[in-house]
């Protein structure tokens, strides 16, 4: 049987050319994404209502979702420290820019965007990097997301 070729996107090389779809609200979270990444594919966490389990979700929707983005990414990394893990973030959401920036800061390897054209994605990724630079340094394990590779890191 022929072996499948690895998936190569920029500097990201994924052993198995499988991208797990981002299935929202509560389906594509850290356990599924981490397991897919551990198995050699690309694990995707859905940002759709990601903070629904937070106690203040109904009263503090934005902060609850931002915390959940960080927590889900950290938990997925614990399952697959070296695997390819990213987020599915719908362009049509009111807080698209905030979700993208938080996913980048959390260490996402890739961001997949649908439900609209992600024309502002590079701008939001660049803004997140600028904020990270202002804070002093990138997070542990930082690498440029493969779909937006500037010529050199800003630090």
Q: Positions of the model-derived regions?
A:
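Active-site entrance/lid segments in N-terminal catalytic domains of soluble metabolic enzymes
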Residues: 1-155
